[in-house]
C-alpha cells in the first residue's frame, strides 16, 4: 500500500457535495489506498507531499529521513531536497471523505481516522495500541538570545521576544536543509521563518503562507537552474 497521489492526479470534491463513504474495496476515481501512508500503512496524518510526488504522514517522512540519514523518498528512493510541503489538497479532501473503520465498522471522517483507531477497542485488541513514530522534533539555538529550543517553537519564540530585532543573523533552520546554505537576514527573520519554514499544521493550515512558500521555492529553483545553465554554456 502506498499513497501515490500527486498534485496533478488529484481532484478536489465539490464543496457542495455530500460526504462520500469509501468502502475498503475502493472507488475507481479515488482508491482508498490513496489515503494510506506507505511507511506506517495507516490513514495519512498531516499529509506531506515530497518533490517526487509521493504523500506520507509528516512524522513518517521526517523519521525515515532521520533514521536512515538519507534524503531519499521511502517509496521510490528519489533524492529529496526537503521533507516536502503539506499536501493541502489531500488534507482538504480527507475532511469531506468518510470510511468505515476496518475493525469496528464505525463510519469515520478520514481526517479523524487516526484519532479513532487510537481508542477503537477492536483495533487495539487485534493490533495493540497505535504506536506513533518517535519524536522527530529537532533542536536549534535562537540567533538573537542563544536560547536552545525546539525548531517548532522558534517562530513563536521570535514573535514573543524578538519582534523588533533587526540585527543581521543566520537562520538556524536553513542549516538542516540539504540544498540550502545559511542565510543572513538584515530584515525580518520572523517573516523568513513564516515563508520558508512554517510548512506544517495542526488544526488548520494557513494556505496563503504555504502558497507563498511554494512559489518562492519554485522561483529560487528556476533561478538556480538558469545560473547553472549559463555557467555551463
UniProtKB/Swiss-Prot annotation:
Pathway: Protein modification; protein ubiquitination
Lipidated positions per record (N-myristoyl glycine): 2
Compositional bias per record (Low complexity), positions renumbered to this chain: 1-17
Region described as Interaction with the RING-type zinc finger: spans on this chain: 110-114
Reaction(s) catalysed (UniProt annotation): S-ubiquitinyl-[E2 ubiquitin-conjugating enzyme]-L-cysteine + [acceptor protein]-L-lysine = [E2 ubiquitin-conjugating enzyme]-L-cysteine + N(6)-ubiquitinyl-[acceptor protein]-L-lysine
Compartments reported by the entry: Golgi apparatus membrane
Zinc finger (RING-type) stretch: 37-77
GO molecular function: p53 binding; ubiquitin conjugating enzyme binding; ubiquitin protein ligase activity; ubiquitin-protein transferase activity; zinc ion binding
Pfam family, one: zf_C2HC_14
Binding positions for Zn(2+) 1 per the UniProt entry: 37, 40, 57, 60
Positions bound to Zn(2+) 3: 101, 104, 116, 120
Region span, Required for interaction with ubiquitin and for autoubiquitination: 211-225
PTM entry text: Autoubiquitinated, leading to its subsequent proteasomal degradation.
Keyword Zinc-finger among record annotations: yes
Region (Disordered) residue spans: 1-27
E.C. number: 2.3.2.27
An example Gene Ontology CC term for this record: cytosol
Domain writeup: The C2HC RNF-type zinc finger and the linker region stabilize the RING-type zinc finger, leading to promote binding of the RING-type zinc finger to the ubiquitin-conjugating enzyme E2 (donor ubiquitin).
Function: E3 ubiquitin-protein ligase that mediates ubiquitination and subsequent proteasomal degradation of target proteins, such as RIGI, MAVS/IPS1, IFIH1/MDA5, JAK1 and p53/TP53. Acts as a negative regulator of type I interferon production by mediating ubiquitination of RIGI at 'Lys-181', leading to RIGI degradation. Mediates ubiquitination and subsequent degradation of p53/TP53. Mediates ubiquitination and subsequent degradation of JAK1. Acts as a positive regulator of T-cell activation.
Protein name, entry field: E3 ubiquitin-protein ligase RNF125
Record organism: Mus musculus (Mouse)
Amino acid at each position: 500500500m502506498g499513497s501515490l497521489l500527486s498534485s496533478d492526479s488529484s481532484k478536489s470534491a465539490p464543496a457542495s457535495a455530500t460526504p462520500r463513504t469509501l468502502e475498503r474495496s475502493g472507488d475507481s476515481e479515488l482508491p482508498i489506498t490513496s489515503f494510506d501512508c506507505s511507511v506506517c500503512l495507516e490513514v495519512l496524518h498531516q499529509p506531506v507531499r515530497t518533490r517526487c510526488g509521493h504523500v506520507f504522514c509528516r512524522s513518517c517522512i521526517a523519521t525515515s529521513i532521520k533514521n536512515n540519514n538519507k534524503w531519499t523518498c521511502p517509496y521510490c528512493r528519489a533524492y529529496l531536497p526537503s521533507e516536502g510541503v503539506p499536501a493541502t489538497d489531500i488534507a482538504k479532501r480527507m475532511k469531506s471523505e468518510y470510511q468505515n473503520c476496518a475493525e469496528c465498522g464505525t463510519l469515520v471522517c478520514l481526517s479523524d481516522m487516526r484519532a479513532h483507531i487510537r481508542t477503537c477497542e477492536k483495533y487495539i485488541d487485534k493490533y495493540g495500541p497505535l504506536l506513533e513514530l518517535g519524536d522527530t522534533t529537532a533542536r536549534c539555538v535562537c540567533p538573537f538570545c542563544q536560547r536552545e529550543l525546539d525548531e517548532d517553537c522558534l517562530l513563536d519564540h521570535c514573535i514573543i521576544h524578538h519582534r523588533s530585532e533587526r540585527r543581521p543573523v543566520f537562520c538556524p533552520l536553513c542549516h538542516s536543509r540539504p540544498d540550502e546554505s545559511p542565510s543572513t537576514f538584515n530584515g525580518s527573520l520572523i517573516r523568513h521563518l513564516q515563508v520558508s519554514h512554517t510548512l506544517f499544521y495542526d488544526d488548520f493550515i494557513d494556505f496563503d503562507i504555504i502558497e507563498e512558500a511554494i512559489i518562492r521555492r519554485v522561483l529560487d529553483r528556476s533561478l538556480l537552474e538558469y545560473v547553472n545553465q549559463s555557467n555551463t554554456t
